[in-house]
Design a protein with these regions (language model features):
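Exported/extracytosolic protein signature
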Residues: 1-273
């Protein structure tokens, strides 16, 4: 009779359903702006899952980690969630800065102990698109025809004056269809010209500079004749535009000179006899 009973230990694997989602508060952020990702993990049960781990795979470039909640390690991309009971939810937020333009995908995945009855919801991804951006700068300096620097740059009425304009693009995108406009009083500055392809060309309402590459600087020379009857301050302004919507920086530059009569110049000459 002693051999009429038997026993066997059966290990029952917990049944779980881990699911993950990831969203971003702004899918079209501007360059150098802050965005926040929210990762949500839920265990739909019916049993608890232990050692739940989330892997957050960042793009190789385009985003810089700023801060996060929870036990997220930005160096490894691992978030150790720990145990999730049936119908329990865990949430992680990650704040980042956009550091490039373009489209960037961020992927996440989750796994833990137990038999996961639905693997299709263990992965998620979210995309952001950072539009083109340019940081431009323009300067204008009177560099020719100046006879005195203090207290104002002085030019002689009736003589030529030359201006040097420099347009710089600091990126991160190519500045497309850049257009330059020179604003001046044509009663004060006569016969305004700019230098192009080895020739002086009459200025007429504006100059199409075309595209300016990242870290490229374009120099434009202008020259004009100061009206012989002009006296006092002469202001000259240049402006630039581009068809890049997110354009930043300095789009206008001014230069002021003082027109004087030739007779106001004083020449000191010392001779030894």
């Amino acid at each position: 009779i002693s051999n009429n009973n038997d026993s066997e230990t059966v290990k029952v694997t917990p049944l779980v359903d881990l699911a993950i989602t990831k969203v971003v508060d702004n899918a079209n952020p501007l360059f150098d702006s802050i965005i926040t990702y929210t990762i949500t993990v839920v265990n739909n049960g019916p049993d608890a899952s232990t050692d739940v781990v989330v892997k957050d795979i960042w793009p190789a470039n385009g985003l810089k980690f700023i801060t996060s909640t929870g036990t997220y390690n930005p160096a490894t991309g691992i978030w150790n969630v720990g145990e999730l009971g049936s119908n329990e939810i865990a949430t992680l937020t990650i704040t980042a800065k956009t550091t490039a333009v373009g489209k960037f995908e961020n992927k996440v995945s989750v796994n833990g102990t137990g038999y996961d009855s639905n693997l299709s919801n263990n992965n998620a991804s979210v995309n952001i698109t950072v539009p083109d951006c340019v940081i431009l700068n323009i300067t204008k300096v009177a560099t020719g025809g100046i006879v005195s620097e203090e207290p104002n740059k002085e030019v002689i009425a009736g003589e030529k004056i030359t201006y040097t304009v420099i347009v710089s693009n600091y990126g991160p995108s190519v500045a497309t269809n850049v257009y330059l406009t020179d604003l001046f009083n044509d009663d004060e500055l006569l016969n305004m010209e700019y230098y192009s392809n080895g020739n002086w060309v009459k200025y007429n309402n504006g100059i199409a500079l075309g595209d300016i590459d990242v870290n490229e600087a374009v120099m434009i020379l202008f020259r004009a004749t100061v009206n012989h009857s002009t006296r006092g301050l002469i202001n000259n302004t240049v402006r630039i535009t581009t068809d890049i919507k997110d354009a930043r920086g300095n789009f206008e530059a001014n230069e002021t000179v003082k027109a004087i009569d030739n007779s106001t110049l004083v020449i000191n000459k010392t001779s030894n006899v």
